[in-house]
Amino acid sequence: MLVNVLTTGDDVSEKLKTYCNGLPDVDKKVMDAASDEGKGFMAAHGVSAAPMIVVLDEDGKELLKTINMDELVKFFA
């Protein structure tokens, strides 16, 4: 499982990044939404705004796309 964190440098981005960095047993990738990598990822996954969390399985299938912290916590519970 790969947790992708698209950030914008705001408080919400920091909270999401901090939570995801603390998750055990998952790969994590943090990207600045304004970077070329971030823009490419957003285009590829239909993300129109950041911050955003996109969780992918091993095959690249989207399991979760959210900015909602409660939804994120529930998913990993």
Label each region the model flagged.
Residues 45-55:
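Structural micro-motif
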Residues 11-12, 37, 62, 72:
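Flexible, glycine-rich phosphate/dinucleotide-binding loops
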Residues 38-45:
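N-terminal beta-loop-helix "entrance" segment that forms/cooperates
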Residues 14-18, 40, 67:
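Generic recognition of short, well-ordered alpha-helical segments
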Residues 4-8, 25-38:
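Thiol-based oxidoreductase modules, predominantly thioredoxin-like and allied folds used
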